[in-house]
Regions:
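N-terminal beta1-alpha1 cap of cysteine-dependent amidohydrolase-like domains
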Residues: 1-78, 83, 96, 107-112, ...
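Active-site catalytic microenvironments for nucleophilic, acid-base chemistry
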Residues: 19, 90-91
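Conserved catalytic-site region of short-chain dehydrogenase/reductase
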Residues: 86-88
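Pocket-forming structural segment of enzyme catalytic cores
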Residues: 91-166
Length: 167
């Protein structure tokens, strides 16, 4: 189930899943709390600023509580994509300081471009460095190329929650 809260890159997510899992999964896009609760897996996309995505989540009455119950209380798999993942943090500093979902202790901050060493926004294909076994990377080889479009990064307090990095 893909959560539709009017701030996600939903068409890109649907196209990606259709490309890699066509006929293997049933994709449903919804903001219906009952459908989200009854799902076995949920995807939380996100596009735009941290603040706008958090505000959009909060604008749907009961959605944050439903996602908390789903992921934290019931420990069901929830995949955050882009800002969807960043919102798992305690806090984000894009635009203004904004409280996140608080599922993973840490903060979302602007990427340190190390005095121009890295161009921002970070756009393009980069290799990922898998540093920890994770279900999300089960069938993905280390140094695989992934596509990135972002200027902010999630810095968790506990580095043991990091599964992969990129330069």
């Amino acid at each position: 189930t893909i959560v539709d809260y009017n701030s996600g890159n939903i068409s890109s997510v649907i196209n990606s899943f259709n490309e890699v899992a066509k006929d293997k999964i049933n994709i449903e896009v919804t903001s219906d709390l009952k459908k989200i609760k009854s799902s076995d897996k949920v995807i939380l996309p996100g596009q735009g600023s941290f603040k706008n995505c958090v505000d959009a989540l909060n604008s749907i009455n009961g959605l944050v509580d439903t996602l908390n119950e789903f992921a934290i209380n019931n420990k069901k798999p929830l995949l955050g994509i882009c800002v969807g993942l960043q919102m798992f943090a305690d806090i984000g500093y894009e635009e203004i300081e904004t409280k996140g979902l608080g599922w993973i202790s840490g903060a979302v901050t602007k990427i340190d471009n190390q005095n121009g060493k890295y161009k921002l926004p970070h756009i393009g294909w980069n290799q990922i460095n898998i540093i920890k076994n994770s279900r999300i990377f089960k069938d993905i080889e280390n140094n695989s190329h992934m596509y990135f479009v972002h200027s902010y990064e999630f810095i968790p307090e506990d580095k043991n929650v990091i599964s992969a990095t990129t330069d």
